[in-house]
Amino acid sequence: MVLFSLVATHADIDLETVAQLSNGSSGIAASVLSGSPAVSGAVVLATCNRYEIYGEAPNTDDVEAARAALVAQISAQSGLAEPLVSRSFSTRTGPEVTRHLFAVSAGLDSAVVGEREIAGQVRRALITAQHEGTASSGLVRLFQAASKTAKDVGAQTALGSRGLSIVSVALDLATDLSENPDWSAKKVVVFGTGAYAGATMALLRERGCTDVSVFSSSGRAEGFVATRGGTALDADSLRPAVAAADVMIGCSGSDTRVEADELAQVRAGSAQPLIAIDLALTHDFDPAVGELNGVELLTLESVRLAAPQEQAESLAQASGIVKGAAKAFEQEREARSVDSAIVALRRHTMDVLDAEMEKVRARHGCTAAAEEVEFALRRMVKQLLHVPTVRARELAANGQQDDYVAALEALYGITVEQPGTAAPAAGQAECPVDHKGLESA
């Protein structure tokens, strides 16, 4: 199996294109898995400034076909032309996939370097894929290892110790733009009830803001404020709340958004300035809102440009942890890649042993002598398999697992099956041999 990823982020393309690519992202993995044999598993990581698809293909030759299938599906769901979709994604394979995801999960590839929200988004991406049945075992191990690496970076370095996040930087910008920096005196309207909305509520509370109203186009505001505080808004109460607001924050990314002309009508009788913070990748607020008199619009691009740089020492430490963890993961993955070869060699050896024991039983029956011969042969086979098994692990750790497989085919004529397609163990004969002892070789 081969890991690969398609990556589109704020570092390479504009956020508007990232938003367009991510339209309908929730169904991409399942659609491609059902329609393309080149994709064995897929996990989609979609955040406010990145859209990445991690996949597993049966072999290296299938990666290009897998990429083409994903590009075609994304094009169909987003409405973007296939050539544009294809150009928007960079493709990674093998160890590059591991290094990139580990860096992403640790916050090293974020617009706000060191931010902690991305680690939770990586975890939720895996949970979603598992729920939808699209996460292969290789991808599960990859994402779990990435989450562990993020925890290690948080525990062993000062990266992210300031608690910086996209939300916190946005609120800092809003503070700088306000005539009155005191959040306890501000009226805030939050759009959305997802993870970003939850983080926003927590940070507003930390800054002393108590007058917070929440609107959800899906009707989840009541349940949201029940555990986080604030006032739930419906369609009728939203207009007067926006008219009186000092700040409104978009975190929903829903199909409905606040249009500029609509906001102008609602705010027509208000003399106080309004700061609109749009943290939704697909825009909760019409970009033309920023052209209205008395309205200051902050976007994800504003946050990216204003994000402070982390200290060089913290970055170096975090990068070292990520590099070491990625290398260890790849070594373990390479060791796992020879499991099929080891199983094939054991099966071949056991077939020979079983054939010889059939001859013994045909001559002596299931006698004590036959059992003694069988026991001796099993011990001998276990000893003979020990060195080839150890060498398989050593070669895999050095990236030479293909040499081991080639040697088995050349010396014994053994065809090594792909992981997940191994044939069931051969049936056991009368007076059976207990094969468990060989599994520990």
Swiss-Prot record:
GO biological process: protoporphyrinogen IX biosynthetic process from glutamate
Pfam families: GlutR_dimer, GlutR_N, Shikimate_DH
Keywords: NADP, Oxidoreductase, Porphyrin biosynthesis
Catalytic activity: (S)-4-amino-5-oxopentanoate + tRNA(Glu) + NADP(+) = L-glutamyl-tRNA(Glu) + NADPH + H(+)
MF GO annotations: glutamyl-tRNA reductase activity; NADP binding
Enzyme class: oxidoreductase
Pathway: Porphyrin-containing compound metabolism; protoporphyrin-IX biosynthesis; 5-aminolevulinate from L-glutamyl-tRNA(Glu): step 1/2
Enzyme Commission number(s) of this protein: 1.2.1.70
Domain of life per record: Bacteria
Keyword match Phosphoprotein: no
Binding site for NADP(+): 192-197
Residues that coordinate or bind substrate: 47-50, 110, 115-117, 121
Site (Important for activity): 100
Signal peptide (residue range): none
Active site positions, chain numbering: 48
Function: Catalyzes the NADPH-dependent reduction of glutamyl-tRNA(Glu) to glutamate 1-semialdehyde (GSA).
Family membership: Belongs to the glutamyl-tRNA reductase family.
Record remark on domains: Possesses an unusual extended V-shaped dimeric structure with each monomer consisting of three distinct domains arranged along a curved 'spinal' alpha-helix. The N-terminal catalytic domain specifically recognizes the glutamate moiety of the substrate. The second domain is the NADPH-binding domain, and the third C-terminal domain is responsible for dimerization.
Subunit description: Homodimer.
Note: During catalysis, the active site Cys acts as a nucleophile attacking the alpha-carbonyl group of tRNA-bound glutamate with the formation of a thioester intermediate between enzyme and glutamate, and the concomitant release of tRNA(Glu). The thioester intermediate is finally reduced by direct hydride transfer from NADPH, to form the product GSA.
Name of the protein in its database record: Glutamyl-tRNA reductase
Originating gene: hemA
